Curated annotation (Swiss-Prot):
It catalyses: tRNA(Val) + L-valine + ATP = L-valyl-tRNA(Val) + AMP + diphosphate. This is Valine--tRNA ligase. A motif ('KMSKS' region) lies at residues 560-564. One of its GO terms (biological process) is valyl-tRNA aminoacylation. Monomer. GO terms for molecular function: aminoacyl-tRNA deacylase activity; ATP binding; valine-tRNA ligase activity.
Length: 954
């Protein structure tokens, strides 16, 4: 077996990762087996933005997904990881708009709709593959031939189908309601795209004169109204007070004169009003504030829209009733002085005019949150516009029940409450966007403005009996991106066709996603899926059985990673490494706010003075898994990454040690398993059990810890060392047993670790497989290790644990007394239990070899020991005679520390047992255990004190 000598000194990830991945992909190993007799397992990846690039959050979530996918594939399941990308309407349109502005000095309007959309498709073709290539670098075992895009023909058909069916069911309608309006981008945006920024503003107190000689309780002929938005006051249709506010109760139902506009508006009572805010009187502007909009609906107030879509003051107010239709007979003229003014210029002028009229009572500083569009970067305006809506309440009820009944489980469970709180207070969903890039709304208008909804124009004409003379114009708007991504689990599997993939893989098994999109995406997927996908009995299908919610990956200081903070880490840089110069360019080039560049460069130079070293994909994946404690945000830690790169090197070196051992004997013949062989097999079996249990609970951190602990602390640090005496002095049967155990445990360990660290395990496994007579092509398709009940050996575990403690105690004595490792020592035991005496008898040779001992002796009960350094292992006293070795002062200093340690433990337990609350609440068994520990420490303390006296007397 000459191949065992062909293993490089070091593992070089960059030399093997991409070649291995290419081989896996070309061999079709990522495809489902389509074995109808095997259980199916499917994960649908949250589709990243098509023009985006991979960030640490993607790497984190995808590592966890790939671990589950690889594990289930090795379990023999028919496994599909469904991937794809999202067209990301507003984000993609903006990227391309910025690009043509920078390169050609043009806007999308210069191109026109069709040409601009073609420009986006070109951009998608150019940059759309970036993220897929980066995902390959992570080792993601995705069936790339099934990759989908939310604007593929198939998915577009599914979107139209859903829209038309919901419209036919009366669940989609068009109406004029208040939305988040971005005055720069000229589109409605979702709450998720609104960023509330802390701002130092003002609270203006204006006097609104009372009409018809009415007076307040304290004799004033006006009410003082507090507002943070003077510019919208021209659209006021009421002022409101709290119904129980005694100051104003007598005025409810009376009217005030709206200054500047000179129209009468009512004083209404509503519990929405906070009596403590300002003066306890607020203006109600239903067309320009979400809360006021709800108040307006309750009191049947007209909505007076005074802003254009650019957020300038209109020439004529638009007056709408609570039914969303134009309202006749309500006068609301906008004074000429304000027409056409930009909203903040209007604010200034209105405040100045109030002051000139003597109606400005006071201005107070006020901290407030101003909503900004996260893409347009300007304050959002609540705006009355015509939009398409989904009436989601009927869909939400079914989706709530699915979680209540446990058909869908959230991990961690506390996220169910967040889901319920959103879903039980759900509002109709605005699904139209005033963009060009996206799924065009399948609705057409005739010259009279009648609306026709169907899958295409041809269907409109046949469905509504319209001949070709009727001119039709398609709705200009596109659908909210979340509408199409809400269909993701079933549209990607071929719905509305009843495909074999849909039958085989739906519902999917688990969704791994961030908490921030539970409502925007997760809830909508549940609602849409359960409405449109039914099983053979007509029961609504869930999209997935489990939602595993991850935290955010933050930087080492706990800050959110963002381009503007300059603290973004690119997963590919963790894999390949990056120079400081390139990292600086990446973090400070093309910045939206160039003034931050110097600060970012300084922080980067401090943190990454040498740049970032290459760590390889496996080290990155292992780190991400090890940090994945349930649902918590993660502070990224470069030291952990280095530690896990060292772990990969340790695994490589251990494998090399095993496979290049010239004494390795895998021939047929008699075998005699040693205690160490039995122990390592039992330990491995426990590790498999821990890994499987942890993975079933989505505790990826515990899976990683189990592999790390076994590989580093048991296999490498102990078992490899325990085999050295066998290879040096064992008989043929013992050497065969050690050889078999080494190679078989290593091969199984590689299979166990493969889902987490696929590249290094495949690379080593290719070298190991010949030693264990496996001819298969890839570790990927090997069975995942099972828990083997007959491999548990508690006796071997207990015996080795005791021997390890003895060996460590002797090694510590050597280190503390500065005795060279090569120098043979004698070891004496006192107070040795019968059980441990038996172990010692059988394992003396092993103990001598491992602890470099010349002699091992058990002292009789009354036998005096020579001058010696002592350590305790349980109740047994270990004595190493020090004639010719000892440094009296150093030994006394060491014993003083030991005495302090034992005294502290005795004191700690005494305090615990004298704590009445502890004794009252703790179970009897716990108290008994503490008393037992107390006796052990007390006894140990006395022995060390005796030893101290003995050495002091020398």
């Amino acid at each position: 077996m000459t191949q065992k000598f062909e293993m490089a000194d070091r593992f070089n990830p960059s030399a093997v990762e991409q070649a291995l991945y290419q081989h896996w992909e070309e061999s079709g190993y990522f495809k489902p087996s389509e074995n109808e007799n095997a259980p199916s397992y499917c994960i649908a990846i949250p589709p990243p933005n098509v023009t985006g690039s991979l960030h640490m959050g993607h790497a984190f979530q995808q590592t966890l997904m790939d671990t589950l996918i690889r594990f289930n594939r090795m379990e023999g399941h028919n496994t599909l990881w469904q991937a794809g990308t999202d067209h990301a309407g507003i984000a993609t349109q903006m990227v391309v708009e910025r690009k043509i502005a920078a390169e050609e000095g043009k806007t999308r309007h210069d191109y026109g709709r069709e040409a601009f959309i073609n420009k986006i498709w070109d951009w998608k073709a150019y940059s759309g593959g970036t993220i897929s290539q980066q995902m390959r670098r992570l080792g993601n075992s995705i069936d790339w031939e099934r990759e989908r895009f939310t604007m593929d023909d198939g998915l577009s058909n599914a979107v139209k189908e859903v829209f038309v069916r919901l419209h036919e069911e009366g669940l989609i309608y068009r109406g004029k309601r208040l939305v988040n309006w971005d005055p720069k981008l000229h589109t409605a945006i979702s709450d998720l795209e609104v960023e509330n920024k802390e701002s130092k503003g003002s609270l203006w107190h204006f006097r609104y004169p009372l009409a018809n000689d009415a007076k307040t309780a304290d004799g004033k002929d006006y009410l003082v109204v507090a507002t943070t938005r003077p510019e919208t006051m021209l659209g006021d249709t009421a002022v409101a007070v709290h119904p129980e506010d005694e100051r104003y109760q007598s005025l409810i139902g009376k009217t005030v004169i709206l200054p500047l506009a000179n129209r009468e508006i009512p004083i209404i009572a509503d519990e929405y009003v906070d009596r403590e805010f300002g003066t306890g009187v607020v203006k109600i502007t239903p067309a320009h504030d979400f809360n006021d909009y709800e108040v307006g609906k309750r009191h049947n107030l007209p909505m007076v829209n005074v802003l254009t879509l650019n957020a300038n003051i209109r020439d004529e107010a638009e007056i709408i009733g609570t039914d969303g239709k134009p309202l006749a007979g309500y006068e609301a003229t906008i004074p000429a002085d304000y027409r056409g003014l930009e909203r903040f210029a209007a604010r200034k002028k209105i405040v100045a005019d109030f002051e000139a009229l003597g109606l400005l009572d006071e201005i107070k500083p006020h901290d407030l949150k101003v909503p900004y569009g996260d893409r347009g970067g300007v304050p959002i305006e609540p705006m009355l516009t015509d939009q398409w809506y989904v009436s989601v309440k009927p869909l939400a009820d079914v989706a709530i029940k699915a979680v209540e009944d446990g058909e869908i489980q959230f991990v961690p469970k506390q996220y169910e409450n967040l889901y319920f709180s959103w879903m039980r207070d759900i509002q109709d969903w605005c699904i139209s966007r005033q963009l060009w890039w996206g799924h065009r709304i399948p609705a057409w208008y005739d010259a009279e403005g009648n609306v026709y909804v169907a899958r295409n124009e041809e269907e409109v004409r046949s469905k509504y009996n319209l001949d070709s003379a009727v001119e039709l114009k398609q709705d200009e708007d596109v659908l909210d991106t979340w509408f199409s991504s809400g269909l993701w689990t079933f549209s990607t599997l071929g719905w509305p066709e009843q495909t074999k993939e849909l039958k085989m893989f739906h519902p999917t098994d688990v969704l791994i996603t961030g908490f921030d999109i539970i409502f925007f995406w997760v809830a909508r997927m549940i609602m849409f899926t359960m409405h449109f996908v039914k099983d053979e009995n007509g029961k609504p299908q869930v999209p997935f059985k489990t939602v595993y919610v991850t935290g955010l990956i933050r930087d080492e200081q706990g800050q959110k990673m963002s381009k503007s903070k300059g603290n973004v880490l690119d997963p590919i840089d963790m894999i390949d490494g990056i120079s400081l110069e390139d990292l600086l360019e990446k973090r400070t080039g093309n910045m939206m706010q160039p003034q931050l560049a110097e600060k970012i460069a300084k922080a980067t130079r401090k943190e990454f003075a040498e740049g970032i070293a290459a760590h390889g994909t496996d080290a990155l994946r292992f780190t991400l898994a090890a940090l994945a404690s349930n649902g918590r945000d993660i502070n990224w830690d470069m030291k952990r990454l280095e530690g896990y790169r060292n772990f990969c090197n340790k695994l490589w070196n251990a494998s090399r040690f095993v496979l290049t051992n010239e004494k390795l004997d895998l021939s047929q013949g008699e075998i005699e398993f040693s205690l160490a062989d039995r122990w390592i097999q039992s330990e491995f079996n426990r590790t498999v059990e821990t890994f499987r249990n942890s993975l079933s609970q989505y505790r990826f951190d515990l899976c990683a810890n189990a592999i790390y602990e076994f590989t580093w602390n048991q296999f490498c640090d102990w078992y490899l060392e325990l085999t050295k005496p066998v290879f040096a002095n064992g008989n043929a049967a013992q050497i065969r047993a050690a050889s078999q155990t080494l190679v078989h445990v290593l091969e199984k360990l590689l299979r166990l670790a493969h889902p987490l660290i696929p590249f290094i395990t495949e690379e080593i496994w290719q070298k190991v497989k010949g030693f264990v007579d496996i001819t298969a092509d890839s570790i990927m398709l090997q069975p995942f290790p099972q828990v083997e009940e007959n491999c548990f050996d508690p006796e071997a575990e207990a015996e080795i644990e005791w021997l390890k403690e003895v060996i460590v105690a002797v090694r510590n004595i050597r280190a503390e007394s500065n005795i060279a490792p090569s120098k043979g020592l004698d070891l004496l035991f006192r107070n040795l239990s019968a059980e441990n005496a038996k172990i010692l008898e059988k394992q003396t040779a092993l103990l001598k070899a491992m602890a470099k001992l010349d002699n091992v002796q058990v002292l009789a009960a009354n036998e005096t020991a020579p001058l010696a350094v002592a350590k305790l292992v349980g109740n047994a006293e270990l004595l190493v005679p020090m004639a010719g070795f000892i440094n009296k002062e150093a030994e006394l200093a060491r014993l003083t520390k030991e005495i302090e340690k034992y005294q502290n433990e005795v004191k700690r337990i005494e305090n615990k047992l004298s704590n009445e609350a502890f004794v009252a609440k703790a179970p009897e068994a716990v108290i008994a255990k503490e008393r037992e520990k107390q006796a052990e420490y007390q006894s140990g303390l006395e022995k060390i004190q005796e030893q101290y006296k003995a050495i002091e007397a020398l």
